[in-house]
């Protein structure tokens, strides 16, 4: 598990920086943003869960904070830190804005998690507290909708 990996690293006693993140997306690979762009372009209606809340993380912003830590020579600040973009949304909110920014007209409807049975138990609230990271490294974290706009613009340019 991720926790076991973190504990193993901590047990070595070496200097380390572990960054926990959530709801990660980018222009590359498979992720929620690209899936929603495709589904909202090909469906008239779509159900998305509204009872799971968190904060999306743009991979470009995660890379920027890692670069900031390295470039400002702060690698001695050992510990576990949380990083995601600023703000909070549900998967439903996230999907609606992805659809809108992508120029799609799909009718996205809210639903409960129980409507999509999964062997993996997902938390209903998974917002990460970034205060330690921001205070320790002096990094200004972008708001999730601003980063989403940037990602969708880059996806549009790549077409």
Regions found by a protein language model. Give the residues of each.
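Active-site helix of classical SDR
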Residues: 1
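Amphipathic alpha-helical segments that line or abut small-molecule/effector binding pockets
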Residues: 60-71, 145, 149
């Amino acid at each position: 598990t991720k926790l076991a990996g973190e504990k193993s690293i901590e047990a070595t006693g070496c200097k380390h920086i572990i960054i926990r993140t959530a709801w990660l997306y980018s222009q590359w690979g498979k992720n929620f943003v690209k899936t929603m762009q495709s589904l909202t372009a090909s469906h008239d209606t779509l159900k998305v869960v509204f009872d799971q809340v968190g904060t999306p993380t743009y991979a470009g912003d995660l890379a920027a904070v890692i670069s900031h830590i390295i470039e400002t020579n702060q690698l001695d600040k050992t510990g576990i830190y949380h990083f995601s973009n600023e703000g909070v949304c549900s998967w439903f909110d996230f999907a609606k804005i992805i659809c809108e920014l992508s120029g799609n007209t799909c009718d996205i409807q809210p639903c409960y998690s129980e409507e999509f049975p999964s062997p993996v138990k997902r938390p209903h609230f998974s917002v990460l507290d970034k205060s330690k990271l921001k205070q320790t490294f002096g990094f200004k974290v972008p708001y999730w909708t601003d980063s989403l706009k940037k990602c969708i613009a880059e996806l549009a340019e790549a077409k």
